[in-house]
Amino acid sequence: LHALGPAGVESMTSAAGVAHLAGFRYGALGLPLAFVALPLYVYMPAYYAEQFGASLAALGIVLLLVRIFDAVTDPLMGYAADHLLSMSGPRRMLLMGVGCGVLLLGFLGLFFPPPSMRQGVALLAWCFAMLIVTYLAYSALSITHQAWAARLQGGDLSQSRWVSWREAATLAGVVLASVLPSVAGMSVTTTVLGLALALAWLALRGAPQPLIMGSVGLTWHRLAQPWRGAAFRGLLGVFLLNGIASAIPATLLLFFVNDRLQAPGLEGMFLAAYFVCAAASLPLWLKVVARIGLGAGWMSGMLLSVASFAGAAVLGAGDVWPFLLICAASGLALGADLAFPAPLLARVIRLDGASAGLEGAYFGWWNSASKLNLALAAGLVLPLLQGLGYSPGQPSAQGLMALSLAYAVVPCILKLLAWGALWRWRRQWDKEQ
């Protein structure tokens, strides 16, 4: 640095500041998008049951239908993202603004239905319609946001930085959304969401703009293009195994805290430790990318996850502090799951010459698989637990053992399988560092 002289040091500092500002401007949209996702998944069912007396069984059917629709339409949203990213800057930002507005209106309509639609079948129909509107807008914006980074020039480290800014904002949104509805209510939450969307849209206007590659026509051949690449299929298999391993503990967390630890009401503290440590770990994982690369870095994160999480299998009633440490260590490992998969997918897109202009199609299928993870986790592990004798709120010794195995051991086994699958994938496809 001394050899550069004061002007050189100042130039480097200025360049770093510009890079951080660009990363912030790009990543900011992650906050309101995560802000929308958490209340929809966590708060909406209880809100409808408590405020409007909706049947939980009927709400469950509505949510199942909407989530199936959401997962199925993600590849089409990927096409829409490719089309949008092929537009000129002003038109692109206009449509992004429209998407933000539709998202806010859907969220507002969902939590504040008109008085004439607050009972019986009318309420369920309104809920279904608003969920469809909200999910479509959410998927279109989130897939476009992901594909945006993939169209920015740069190699593995550059892509990891864009993704880290996006995921850091996402984690901030998760933490904010986990607290605000219960503390300030849905009116304040909706107002904050509107402000966050507006500010994120303004920030995105000043972010580095994606490379325009020309518009693509909607054909099945174009939508199916990602599946023709063996590298994509292999990486998606790793992503599915790893994602199910992460989704199972998320599905069972409340049961584990309430019945195994006997610490009801402390799940917020555990989640906060998990997500805060994940956010704090992102700069560290960026250094790992620079040192050993994306594939080896993700494998390291998987091993850290297994090493930190396996201990949860032996916890019992009152083991609050050991579990808090496990959550913190697992959060550090989560940073790898956030920082590495998307840049690896961006590399696959770069190496597949036939995929120019189809980044959205790739991320559409990728998001669909991510939603499939959650569905598979719930659909497989909950019936299995019931079959093994676990009953929430009335656990037997056999049921608690089954809960511990399902919560901690099964995810670790799946993580190790994902590690093995990634090791095999890297032998053939991990060519670019």
Features from the language model and the residues they span:
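Membrane-embedded alpha-helical bundles of multi-pass transporters/translocases
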Residues: G8-Q433
